[in-house]
Amino acid sequence: MGSDINYVDDNESSFCSLWSRIHKKIDCVELFSNPNLGDDYFFNRLNISNRCNYVDDILNLIKHNYAFNLNTYYIHSICDNENFVMSNKRKFGTMNILSLDVNEYVMHMGKHIEVDFVDKNDLNEWIEVFCRSFDSVKIRDEVTTIISNQFKKITLLLANYYPNQEKYPAGCCLLYEKNEIIGLYCLGTTQQFRRKGIARELISKAVQIAKSKGYNSMIVQTLIEERYEDFYKKLGFKPIYKKMLHTLYLK
């Protein structure tokens, strides 16, 4: 299972690197930085590898030399890492990484919802829904740059809602493939259309795509404190490992 976790974790790390302005390895710490994304716990991060004997020294080095106009980095460490203790940093939260057996998934057919692939001509619509779903309108320009540059490496899905035969772009997600693993990222719905089955419909479409590509499972991450874990579990996602998140204040 250890090697499986490493492959899953590398899928996540590789996806995060697509969003980074600076991505580098400093001894046993992998740094992902993009000041244009603001205070983001998922993208402005420090991944701690299993064997990290001088972590405090490395974090101090990063704090003084690699701040890049950020206020905070978020330290991500796998919970079964016995060699790593972060007792002197404030805990931010716990991230659960879950896996779905796509062959056992029961499809959900939402009313008045249609999920489509996004091509380059529809990027602005996907970006608009993403920014509204994650309250990230201020970073729209940076998101536009990233998604446009990385378009060929990801699969974008957009959910449209038709309550009265009128189209409302209402939800989004994307799929990223690496290490023979497919990850579901950036799943969100705009505030006015939440609790209408849109996220479920996006997941159903993602499952169809995963199966068509020959995958048996699909991964997703969720911060426990955001309280979406039960939603995923009801759909059949099962936890495979956890990460502890701590804050490294830079100022």
Residues of each region from the PLM?
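Short amphipathic alpha-helix that is part of the acyltransferase structural core
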Residues: 1-12, 45-52, 95, 102-141, ...
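N-terminal charged segments
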Residues: 1-68, 81
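A short helix-loop-beta-strand connector motif used in the catalytic cores of GNAT acetyltransferases and
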Residues: 17-24, 68-71, 94, 148-158, ...
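Acyl-donor-binding surface of acyltransferase catalytic domains
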Residues: 50-113, 246-248
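Conserved acetyl-CoA-binding loop-helix of GNAT-fold acetyltransferases
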Residues: 54-62, 186-189, 195-208, 212, ...
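Conserved GNAT acetyl-CoA-binding A-motif
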Residues: 67-77, 210-222
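Conserved active-site alpha-helix within GNAT-family acetyltransferase domains
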Residues: 80-91, 200, 224-242
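A conserved beta-strand-loop-helix scaffold within acyl/acetyltransferase catalytic domains
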Residues: 137-190
